Regions:
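Active-site-adjacent substrate/metal-binding segments within catalytic domains
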Residues: 2-147, 162, 190, 221-222
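Extracellular glycoside hydrolase catalytic/binding regions
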Residues: 144-227
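Short, positively charged
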Residues: 1-2, 202
Length: 227
């Protein structure tokens, strides 16, 4: 007997050159916000496909061309993004704790990375892989983890970018700076969750922004959350 599988795929290339992001060789700005599937208060994590698609449509109507998912999603989500031109960063669900990941976390992350690439690499909407979100970006252990996982994703899938999303890029004094550079600088794109004037830097916004720009100099900088 024979077996057949049918799926949609597309061809595109997202690359980095200096501080520019290029889509098929042309400079582009990644504009958007994160979205957490399962956020609908009426459905919770049992969110049906039509509700997920309604939220994705809202992103398109807000002129977003990019979003990120904190954890892996069903193929149906990516099929919608494929069809509607919404670029995605799919992330390993490593968020906040532990602040400095060790070897056990790294082993689990590598297992999940392998499964993510195997399951979703045919989706052109996925342009980046994410190795984590909001750890202690100034910790040497976090930096080592990010460098290892970015290299691991590149080994699995050389065609895509790999990044870490930081909430500490602007923390010049708030956390001990074991590392000279924030961990996000070891990904392809410098990704920063920006809460200036709300959660931090209420009294010295200008100083914080100057520090961020100095840190990110020479790399693309994308705001991945804001508030």
């Amino acid at each position: 007997g024979t077996s057949r599988s049918k799926f949609r795929f597309g061809v595109r290339e997202l690359t980095v050159r200096g501080d520019q992001i290029l889509l098929n060789g042309k400079e582009i700005r990644l504009l958007g916000m994160e979205w957490m599937p399962g956020s609908c208060p009426d459905c919770g994590m049992a969110e049906p496909q039509e509700v997920s698609e309604q939220f994705l449509q809202l992103l398109k109507e807000a002129n977003c061309n990019f979003t990120r998912f904190h954890w892996q999603q069903d193929n149906a989500i990516y099929e919608w993004c494929d069809a509607h031109g919404l670029m995605v960063q799919e992330e390993i669900p490593l968020w906040g704790k532990p602040k400095a990941p060790g070897k056990r976390i790294e082993q689990t992350a590598k297992q999940q990375a392998t499964e993510m690439v195997a399951a979703h690499s045919n989706h052109p909407s996925i342009v980046c892989w994410g190795v984590g979100n909001e750890l202690n970006g100034h910790s040497k252990r976090t930096v080592a983890y990010v460098r290892e996982m970015v290299a691991f994703f590149k080994q699995l899938d050389p065609s895509r970018l790999a990044n870490y999303v930081s909430s500490t890029l602007d923390y010049k004094k708030r956390t001990p700076m074991e590392s000279e550079h924030d961990a996000t600088l070891y990904g392809d794109i410098c990704m920063w969750n920006e809460y200036m004037g709300t959660w931090n830097h209420r009294d010295h916004y200008d100083e914080g922004m100057r520090f961020v720009c100095d840190q990110a100099k020479g790399k693309p900088l994308v705001i991945t959350e804001f508030g």
